[in-house]
C-alpha cells in the first residue's frame, strides 16, 4: 500500500493522470483508490453523503486526459469522495463551502481512511484498526 497527496497541477506541473500513470507504472499496484472532494448540486448534501464508485475518478474538467480509470491506468480504479462544495447560485465562477469545512474534512478523512483500512485489512477489527492508526 502506498499513499500520495499529489496537490494541484498548477503547483506540481504534472497532471493528476500523468502522476498516477507514472506511479502505477513504477509500483504496479493491483488497484488504485482515489479520494477527492466532490461538488454537490444541493446544499443539504454538503458533508453529509459519501460516494464510492468503481468507475474511476472524473475531475470536473471536461478534458478526458485527466480521468483516472481502468482504461487510462491499466488497473481497477475506485474513487471515494464527500461533497464539500457547490456552485454559487449567483456567479458562474463562484463556489460555496460550508462554514464547518475543516471539521467536515477531518471527520470525512477519518471515515474514508477507516473504510479503506477495513477493506484492505479484513482480518482486523474496527477496534484494532483504530488502535493501530491512533
What are these regions (language model features)?
Residues 18-67:
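Glycine-rich phosphate-binding loop
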Residues 8, 37-38, 83-85:
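Short, ordered loop/turn segments at secondary-structure junctions
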Residues 1-7:
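Short helix-loop-beta-strand segments that form the rim/entrance of peptidase-like active sites
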Residues 78-134:
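C-terminal functional extensions of proteins
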Residues 3, 13, 21, 69-71:
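Non-transmembrane, aqueous-exposed alpha-helical and coiled segments at domain scale
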Residues 3, 32-34, 77-79:
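Conserved beta-strand scaffold positions in the cores of enzyme catalytic domains, especially
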Residues 60-82:
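Ser/Thr/Gly-rich flexible loops in soluble cytosolic domains mediating phosphotransfer, phosphorylation
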Residues 11, 15-19, 27, 100-111:
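Conserved active-site and cofactor/substrate-binding residues in soluble primary-metabolism enzymes
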